């Protein structure tokens, strides 16, 4: 899908639904994701999952920027240890106004 204009070109936009597993809670992972996503101009949210070793990320925006975010999710902040990353690409919905941390 296209929809975001950049230099009079339509950029391809998408939505990712990702789950990051490993040592990703208690290491400022959610704030790392929020700050990275905002710098990339993405919208959505990040939240801890109740299982204790996983974080959910919902993000929308330019596909190129989403791919950069995915690289950062794999790396994580200092102190994190990412063991696995599950990603689903879904249709862009435009449902988010900002990128936030959910509780």
Predicted regions located by residue number:
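Intrinsically disordered, low-complexity, mixed-charge
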Residues: 2-103
């Amino acid at each position: 899908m296209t929809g975001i204009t950049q230099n009079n070109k339509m950029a391809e936009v998408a939505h990712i639904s990702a789950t990051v597993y490993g040592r990703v809670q208690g290491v400022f992972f959610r704030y790392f994701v929020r700050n990275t996503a905002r710098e990339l101009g993405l919208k959505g949210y990040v939240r801890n999952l109740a299982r204790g070793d996983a974080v959910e990320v919902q993000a929308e925006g330019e596909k190129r920027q989403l791919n950069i975010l995915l690289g950062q999710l794999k790396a994580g902040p200092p102190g994190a240890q990412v063991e696995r990353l599950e990603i689903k690409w879904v249709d862009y919905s435009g449902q988010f106004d900002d990128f936030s941390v959910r509780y």
